[in-house]
Amino acid sequence: MTKIIFMGTPEFSVPVLTQLASTYDVVAVVTQPDRPVGRKRVLTPPPVKKAALELAIPVYQPEKLRTSSELEELIALEADLLVTAAYGQILPNSLLESPKHGAINVHASLLPEYRGGAPVHYALLDGKTETGVTIMYMVEKLDAGDMISQRKIPITDEDNTGTMFDKLSILGAELLMDTLPDFLAGKITATPQDPEKVTFARNISREQEKIDWTKPGRTIFNQIRGLSPWPVAYTTLEEKPFKIWEATYEDTKEGGEPGAILADKTTLKIVAGDGTLIVPTVIQPAGKPKMDVHSFMTGAGRNLSKTTRFGE
């Protein structure tokens, strides 16, 4: 049976691991160290570690694999293939070149578009109507390896980064399992990435999280769903942070200054730069838990003045 080392960390990686383990001999799982989570800073294992332990697979958690003694242990396993999915570290050539069939990665974009750590976020932020997953060779340069297979999936206005992560996680596992038989048999010729079409999905900055109400409504709508459920887009209300977790978009122009409020007893609408409307549905005022807008408008939101504007 084909011996595989799997490397991954978040929930996205779990379906890939479980599918691999159902058919192949996964001899080791490498994931990030346990990290403190939440206000109480409870030391929490990554989702992949939990899944690996349930499957009785040995787990490695080096802080930095490149300089870890565990690197030689992994090479000594003499695996036939290394598979990664959102592991979170650049891997050294000594490991990439050690398996018989090399090292491949499940990447959540249609490469060469969106190389980097936040491809799903950027597909939503940029208003794409489709994205997908790519199986590609691992090289030391970030997400630059030749492409082995690729599969597309639509993005709807109802999607956000969270829903797309779930869909792409399943799609990636399916594509990998469909690809591996021919790949291991040497029947697939990989395709180099077109350097003219390369784009990058770098980690989201704090500045990208802040809503600029002078921008068009569609752009703001894409920002909100592209940053939901993490790190979450925010604006300010009376100089205090105000997060918008979920919203809809109305392509009707009501007039009013950017950030102006149109509200009734149960709904809240905010004017964008082109006059179209953002309609928040789940929000989080400063110092409060997230809530639906109806709860906000029947509580603290009742005191909103028509002269109040978001972003001020």
UniProtKB/Swiss-Prot annotation:
EC number(s) of the enzyme? 2.1.2.9
* Keyword Ligase listed: no
- What CDD domains does the entry give? FMT_core_Met-tRNA-FMT_N, Met_tRNA_FMT_C
Designated name of the protein: Methionyl-tRNA formyltransferase
Q: Describe the function of this protein.
A: Attaches a formyl group to the free amino group of methionyl-tRNA(fMet). The formyl group appears to play a dual role in the initiator identity of N-formylmethionyl-tRNA by promoting its recognition by IF2 and preventing the misappropriation of this tRNA by the elongation apparatus.
Kindly give the InterPro entries that the UniProt entry links to this protein.
Fmt, Formyl_trans_C, Formyl_transf_N, Formyl_transf_N_sf, Formyl_transferase-like_C_sf, GART_AS, Met-tRNA-FMT_C, Met-tRNA-FMT_N
Protein family: Belongs to the Fmt family.
Gene3D superfamilies assigned = 3.40.50.12230
**What is a single cellular component term in the Gene Ontology annotation?**
cytosol
Instruction: Write out the residues that bind (6S)-5,6,7,8-tetrahydrofolate.
Output: 109-112
Q: What is the name of the gene encoding this protein? A: fmt
Recorded source organism is: Listeria monocytogenes serovar 1/2a (strain ATCC BAA-679 / EGD-e)
Task: List keywords of the entry alphabetically.
Answer: Protein biosynthesis, Transferase
Q: Which reaction does it catalyse?
A: L-methionyl-tRNA(fMet) + (6R)-10-formyltetrahydrofolate = N-formyl-L-methionyl-tRNA(fMet) + (6S)-5,6,7,8-tetrahydrofolate + H(+)
Give the top-rank taxon of the lineage listed in the UniProt record for this protein.
Answer: Bacteria
Give the signal peptide, or none.
Answer: none
Query: What is an annotated GO biological process for this record, any one?
Result: conversion of methionyl-tRNA to N-formyl-methionyl-tRNA
Task: List the Gene Ontology MF annotations in alphabetical order.
Answer: methionyl-tRNA formyltransferase activity
